[in-house]
Amino acid sequence: MRPGTPSTPPRALPHPLPRPDGEQAHLERVWQRPRGWCAITVVNNNYIGLLYIGTALLFFLLAGVLALLMRAQLAVPDNDLIGHDLYNQLFTMHGTVMMFLFAVPAVEAMAVLLLPNMLGARDLPFPRLSSYAYWAYAIGGLVFFCSIFVGLAPDGGWFMYPPLTSSAYSPALNADLWLLGIGFIEISAIAGAIELAVGILRTRAPGMTLDKMPIFAWIMLAFSGMVIIAFPAVIVATALLELERAFGLPFFMADKGGDPLLWQHLFWLFGHPEVYIIFLPAAGMVSMIIPAMAGRPLVGYRLVVMAIVATSFLSFGLWVHHMFATGIPQLSLSFASAASMAVSIPTGVQVFAWIATLAAAPRLRPLKTPMLFILGFFFIFVLGGLTGVMVAVIPFDWQAHDTYFVVAHLHYVLVGGMVFPLFAAFYYWMPFVSRRALSERLGRWAFWLMFVGFNIGFFPMHLTGLAGMPRRVYTYADQYGWGLLNMVSTVGAYLIAAGVLVFLIDLARNCRPSVERNAGNVWRAGTLEWLPAGVAGPRSVPWVSSREPLWDQPGLAADVQAGRYYLPGAPTGGRSTLVTGAIDARPQYLLRLPGPGWPPVLAAVGTAGFFLLLTVKLMVPAALFGVLAIAMILRWLWDADPAPDHPPVDVGGGLRLPVSCVGSASHSWWAMVMLVMVCASIFCALLFAYLFLWTTSPEVWPAPAALAAVPWPLASGALLAGSSALAWTGGRGLRRGRQSCLRLALPLGALMLAAAVGLEAGAQWRAGLRPQDHAYAASVYALIGLQGTLAIAVAFMSLFTAARSWAGKLGAARRACFDNTALLWHYTVAQGLVGTLVLHGFPRWAGLA
């Protein structure tokens, strides 16, 4: 905390009028997007957010077309319109695209677009990371979807259960494309989540303490935490299955001590939290729209925040909800069943808060299109929640499992809980990004077609499921009596498509994207995103003293637009935004932001090319694309920590802020902490796999006498500890101005870290352990492989840091690069020590026990 930074609103506005000539023009010039071909290098959140939303909507439409093809096939019994192989690809791609390429990216996209303005910031803290995440998602997703046109689309279902997807039963490249493609796209989602979390915690407007944050910001903070913890599990699962397919490591082969159930545990450790990762942001949009429509603040703000946190925690206890029919012990099933019911309580708190807000409205406003979609959301989502409680009852789940009842429940929860609120958000926030609002008349047509079509399409699926129709069948015999219900469902699906088509017509007729001249606050809402804004966001950054500042401070919009609050210009000559305290939102320093550039785009191309070429086993081109990705990332990071050569800046009211920061106050330090959390989640998922395989096949574990001798892990641990000590010594030398000490310590420490990994792998090999022998060996080498991956990353970072030192870009006051490297370094050492203890201690304990 900087001494003297204000904790209470200023008595007078920070800047007097008139403002200097040319100040606003210079600000807009600094933030202007590139023209021509260079436009794709834009990094502004308002442009990247629009691109994100447009791409997510494209994937929604493509997945919808696949659904229409499936419904056409199922409309009548014994239909031969589509063969079973293509049908398998259609339902796999439909689920995969909807879940991985539409749902999560769409809510992240809304956050990228809205949050900076909602928080009173100029932009997110890592604009080039936003650009990289978007282009990686767009390029990878489009190439992945195009696989269906060449017969390479995955066909094992969107959750890809082995052994069906093992090389024995799916030897073609289809499954590999899913495993590598989706694993790579999840990395993009994690990058976006880290950016959003740091932005919410560190770039809020002065005065916007945690209890004054908009509900949408709270929810996106919870969303980011859930992504950081949950998504690594599916990355681990995809990596293990790809290792089994490519190199024969038997994680899921029962004859070698593996277990296909491990995939289900890892997948649903990610999969069920993902339901709430999708639902919570949609609920956040509802919590923003309803107060604006009701003309009063949200009832029970603190209770809603508590419900958000409770839902986030409970969602991680529900993964067995999807595994009731797998033979898991009854006690475990009972806990999962209870948790599945308990999670409905915080969800109910939010629903009742919305109803209470509408009931307490001072006057009823005309029912506009956003409210129609929200009312549709209420109806559909509550029905989905009721069927969710039904399938949480174990005996009923055994009957309904893998039938169309579950298909209906899934769509009532996800379409009702996410798609309808998202369309409400499109109609509500369109004036924020467009010169014109969307049409009320066309919006009503779109709503009623989608609402009626959805219920006609999916409600009968409850009945077909109860009548015994299984999921994923491409045809059925007339004698089962499912024909009429399936025809009704098909009619409903095409009605939904008609509603979406009306929405697209509305977009084409009325959407005129404009960052500088939008339609304005047509809803008379009270939150900051409705401030007058341009390409740089709001003209000046306000002091926030309530949750609805536009309602409680009537002159705020005019004063912000006149430049009377903080940071009305570009005092550093470039892009910048305020960094504030994570809890109290006191101004701490001015963050200089990078502008547009090619490195993030080329890094995304390289990353996408690397993973996609690995899929088709083109190793040399894949390596070249990987080199391109690493080179471009290093290039953009080279200038990411500018020299503290600018004097403190007067941002208004006599408040002078430095233009750089080091240590735990730095925004980049917070991002690295979150990256460490991702690494820890990956490590925990691998430890879970290691221990789970012990519980299922202890017979393949070696006796204590067959393990590597004790001196090996002791030597490895000593190297790890020495490596950490060298990193600490380098940091001490940097603080004292002894750069030569740092330049020697970092490469030597990285070498010791790599040697520790090599020693551990060598010890296991000398003990006779081969990764293809059995599941125990495979899990041991997987843990060593993770440690080696982190050691390589630390080696790159240490050499990069040493290079910055040689180039004169590192010092006691310019040490963010070293601080971040040291943070990951010490975590890697800690993980290595824990891993060594587990690999050498647990088998001995288990053998003796």
Give the residues covered by each predicted segment:
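Hydrophobic transmembrane alpha-helical segments that form the core helix bundle
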Residues: 725-761
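Acidic/histidine-enriched, beta-strand-rich ligand/metal-binding domains
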Residues: 667, 732, 802-806
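Membrane-embedded and interfacial regions of multi-pass energy-transducing membrane proteins
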Residues: 2-708, 760, 766-772, 778, ...
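Interfacial loop-to-transmembrane junctions
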Residues: 49, 741-744, 803-830
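Final/C-terminal transmembrane alpha-helix of multipass membrane proteins
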Residues: 603, 819-843
